[in-house]
């Protein structure tokens, strides 16, 4: 067994499986007496390995080889010419292979899920208070000069299916619930209320429910819309003196999906109509799925009776995906586009774009378009040039002691409480949150983070990260606190 083989066994115990396979397994180490040269393939990889895992590598080699040694980091690929003993992590991990798979573009055609028609009537009633009552002005209303028929709802996009939704810890509960209601509508989780920030996949999940439910039962009457269109449909039904048709259409749905329901808050007439529509569907065992950017009782201006009804079923969140999931999303997106994307470039983009999935995909498109325009492969260097503004923001230094101070102030405790041995809930939970934030926002290793929190073991940090990730899925208060702290620290 070589020195590096011994080191690998020890290093593996200090890292998650993902970290080990992603960052440690791909490197090559050449040993020449007391000189250890770590080959990292490129500059970005070298900087990351050295900054995040350098101390761990050094201490492990010292433990296995002795203190008299020199470690050098190279941004070049290992040549394969064995001068002395070459120590490797085994076959190079596929994760950082520059080979990519190409497939055909998927169709983005849309299909209309439900299009009931109503005939327009020439007579209209006065509707001067539309802006105040419904949130729309006269410009949003249809007129007699438009087409002779008016359609309710919106079409579902065929590209939004469960297979194209990348699952991770941040969304797996929401995805599982969505799949259940698409197979057995009205039986479980009614209503299903999905909430989370913009660009995190709520609309994708909602439309995937509709598309899959249609496959399961082609005869199901499925209506997909958003709150803006729902308001517009209602206003126009009044304008056309045909509210009965509006009610007949929406209240006869087997599955009703409404995106961004928060926008009906404060719209008295529309909110009342939705309330009665909700009751009619619920009492008849029909499935209701809603999305919002906020938890129901946090939607300002939403009637209490609606908040209460939203709580009848299951409320789940979708949060910003972790690094592993962000990488998977980028690779899947490039795959779907039939584009070549080296895995190391995907990792670079994922590490530097942490806002939402929409911006993550936007960054990917920017890199792919630039590389194609310049007839270059989408390398890390190309990504660095394309995303220099984003990187500049992300490179703002975040220190563990700053995280500790912000968290301590937020929970009204002392910084020394976070590093103490106290295990009471009001201290232990903020400590876990601070550890999780340190893991996400800094380049420090698990042992380094543990040491900053009173000399704790790296396994304690791993446990804290896993615990907080799980709690953010099930505990709204913890999730909201974490997002607020993330925002405060990242400013």
UniProtKB/Swiss-Prot annotation:
Spans annotated as Domain IV, binds dsDNA: 372-491
Region spans: Domain I, interacts with DnaA modulators: 1-69
GO cellular component, one term: cytoplasm
SUPFAM superfamilies reported for this sequence: P-loop containing nucleoside triphosphate hydrolases (SSF52540), TrpR-like (SSF48295)
Primary site of residence: cytoplasm
Entry keyword annotation includes Transcription regulation: no
Positions of ATP binding: 199, 201-203
UniProt keyword annotations, A-Z: ATP-binding, Cytoplasm, DNA replication, DNA-binding, Lipid-binding, Nucleotide-binding
One MF annotation (Gene Ontology) recorded for this entry: lipid binding
Subcellular location: Cytoplasm
CDD domains listed in its UniProt record: AAA, Bac_DnaA_C
Region described as Domain III, AAA+ region: spans on this chain: 155-371
Chain segments carrying region Domain II: 69-154
Gene Ontology terms: biological process: DNA replication initiation; regulation of DNA replication
Pfam family for this entry, one: DnaA_N
NCBIfam families: DnaA (TIGR00362)
Subunit structure and binding partners: Oligomerizes as a right-handed, spiral filament on DNA at oriC.
Known function: Plays an essential role in the initiation and regulation of chromosomal replication. ATP-DnaA binds to the origin of replication (oriC) to initiate formation of the DNA replication initiation complex once per cell cycle. Binds the DnaA box (a 9 base pair repeat at the origin) and separates the double-stranded (ds)DNA. Forms a right-handed helical filament on oriC DNA; dsDNA binds to the exterior of the filament while single-stranded (ss)DNA is stabiized in the filament's interior.
Domain notes: Domain I is involved in oligomerization and binding regulators, domain II is flexibile and of varying length in different bacteria, domain III forms the AAA+ region, while domain IV binds dsDNA.
Family to which the UniProt record says this protein belongs: Belongs to the DnaA family.
The name this protein goes by in its record: Chromosomal replication initiator protein DnaA
UniProt source species: Francisella tularensis subsp. novicida (strain U112)
Species classification: Bacteria, Pseudomonadati, Pseudomonadota, Gammaproteobacteria, Thiotrichales
